Amino acid sequence: MSLPPLVEPAAELTVDEVRRYSRHLIIPDVGMDGQKRLKNAKVLCVGAGGLGSPALMYLAAAGVGTLGIVEFDEVDESNLQRQIIHSQADIGRSKAASARDSVLGINPYVNVILHEERLEADNVMEIFGQYDLIVDGTDNFATRYLVNDACVLLNKPYVWGSIYRFDGQASVFWSEYGPCYRCLYPEPPPPGMVPSCAEGGVLGVLCASIGSIQVTEAIKVLAGVGDPLVGRLMIYDALEMQYRQVKVRKDPNCAVCGENPTVTELIDYEAFCGVVSEEAQEAALGSTITPKQLKEWIDDGENIDIIDVREPNEYEIVSIPGARLIPKNEFLMGTALQDLPQDRRIVLHCKTGVRSAEVLAVLKSAGFADAVHVGGGVIGWVHQIEPEKPVY
């Protein structure tokens, strides 16, 4: 479906801008009018990570006049495998500041606005209100639903992308013309069911593939050219090198954009998405130990069985001495319980403590009352006990 241009054109392009954007200007569908609209556009990128990196770089190169960056994190060495807007010299720096420097290095004519804060229900409306279009580069469900609901309530379009291992998805959500994210995914998955990129990994170059698609869609919406991905979900399988599309219809019963919406103001999205389930939270109360406590138990020869509930490829990267591997899903399916000793105390751990808390809830309900898990997981262990080991 063709849509009208989102923004009005700027008054003019300078001589330098004409020279810079000449390859756009000779495209009939873009031309002077389209480039002036890009110059006048205000686009906010939520996140300067895997998707935000290529998105910001190409938005800047394309000549978007104002770019906002929402990012509160710092550059970590593990980011550099895919977050190409940052460099080795940026490790430890603010991601927002690092991204700004890269953007201005690409295009000094861009006005960059930094929002160095976590995007939350109490600031999202004020931040989003300053921009014409949002590019969602987030990697967690709570923020995705927050972005969606804020955009629906403000009647703003946004370009969404998602990546995991070798798979990517992208769409344009604009409730005035089509469905929103909740029409596609009315409810978040159960806590721990879908691994994050930090848990499951992602092919670095996949970020460029999906991020570039997001920028393409942003340009189309801003300039009013082509047929944006409104009402369509694009799915990319990098292993098979296949693209396919699925039609997404507006849900008349959608909680936020439907005929009788029940979400008319922003909610508690962490609670809505159940970042850690109530069962896991209850199980962890009084049954969480620190890496230092575990080290003391090991040194004292305590009668314990340390179980790593991560995936085999994670176990190969780094592990706690003496831990044996039983992936989380084997507990969720019930097949692992029969392998647990009845005469030893079970100590669970994962990468950070989220998955092990979910497994702890399963063990508690199965009668392993003295089972515990390690808060902070193997990452906490490395930081506190064996700093010479790698983290991921």
Label for each model-derived stretch:
Residues 3-8, 238-252, 256-304, 312-347, ...:
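Rhodanese-like catalytic fold shared by cysteine-dependent sulfurtransferases
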Residues 38, 127-132, 340-341:
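A short, aliphatic-rich alpha-helical micro-motif
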Residues 61-66, 366-369:
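Conserved S-adenosyl-L-methionine
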